[in-house]
C-alpha cells in the first residue's frame, strides 16, 4: 500500500437508513468487485475501472422487517448472497441471474461461508444452516442457545479440514462435521466484564 493512496474509482450504492443497514464488505473475484447494498441489490463492477457490469435485486416476500445485514461471497462462476430478511441466493457471476433463492430461517446477518460444497450461514436467532451450493436445499442445521438480545452482526462460520465452526452470540463455540452437522466438540466462552 502506498504511503499516500490515491482514489482510482468510486461508485454510489444504496447506503444505510433507519430501516436498512449496510454492513457487508465487498468481495473481489475474477477481476470483478461484488457488493450488496442496503436495498438488497447485488452489484458487480469491473475491479479496475469501476464500470458497473450488472445489478440484481434480491426479491423478498418480506414482512415489514428491516434489511439489517447480509453479505456476499464468491466461488468460481457463482456469487452467494444473504439478506437481512433471511434470503440466501446463488447468482451467476457473469450476468447476475439468480440461480436459486431459499429462506432457511430467521434474519441472516453475515456473509455466507463457502466450503465442502455447502453454503454455511448464521441467523440472528443463533441458528447455523448448511445449504447445498448447487440446489440451495438445507442439508443440516443446528441451534445455539437463544438470546433475548444480541449484537447487530453475526460472525460467519469458519470452515476447514472437514470441520465447520460456529460462534453463537450466547458465547457457545461449536465444531461440526461439514457433511452432516454432527457435533464434534463445543465450549462455552465466558463473557468478560
PLM region spans:
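Extracytoplasmic beta-rich repeat domains
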Residues: 3-27, 55-75, 98-115, 138-161, ...
